[in-house]
């Protein structure tokens, strides 16, 4: 919010000429209001307490980008669909590590399926430019989000491979063809320092965008037009090592007594330590992801409607009762009808275009034959249990009934749709139990309930 007065007062006239800002000051309003001194106890302030990571449903909003289970995530997706921003930023404070010397770390979308030009602009131009500017103006070192792990030859600064999944907001931005940026201020830097350096990030990144508006618009427009049909896209990925070592900065922290909770000290890296207390090391950097498994992006995804009742009830894991995303009209209908209603609900939440077939028609494409269908024993983000399928695609010729669901891939959100619908995706509808009305049936179905085709379906 600190950027608003400077813009209103005329200090940022360049922004006024070339940018429109949409500001959500508090994404997790419910969690923000649940202030307690015991929340995030080791974080350096505010010492009088802070809110919770989870919202009122007990869900982490930064895990809701694909399943769309919260009102907050749905509101964000609606805003992105309606306003079509070119750049989006998510501002965080990290959980912290004992001796990182970076007051600010940042990240972009790590998903390997992002448009190449989009990632080049962010990683090769925008982020290096603002990092250099902040170092020159303020003397502060910034780098990509991560932490040191490993010993000996394996010691390296590593990001988190989980961030390649669009359940995380910054990657969700990326697979929607938006230039997504994540900031993670260091939790053991003082509260003042975190606020100030976040302002610097906004100041420099917005100034860059304002002065490179034509480039930004062009990159996003090209990503929206670019067809991924027929490409091999990632469904699983891993971090890879950068070709050159990177300078990683370290600085000590101290334990400080919290005046409100005597037995819960917090960690602090005091302001003004000076260079004498700062060390650095040249380390390998694992900060981008490459595919470990790929598959074909089709022209269309199809969910054939079925009016046949199941022979056994689904052993499904569903969202919490207060969550969004259930089948319209409750649990009525066949398993396929309930599943389709849940899929349509989420497609609409994301803004993904779809259609319903008006008449029976021949279908020629592929179906995924299931070899194994497993459900994780642990609950995650409410009552979800991760589902994983193995198997193989095989050719299929069949009649597609009227009332079937068709999701075309000639649309700007095709990258997101691919991740949501592929049976091997580690962050799609299958993984999040959205298809469990069918996939949870006993005995397990022989085929994945979503078909793909390189042919158009009307």
Can you name each region flagged by the protein language model?
Residues 1-458:
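Structured catalytic-domain cores with a bias toward divalent-metal coordination
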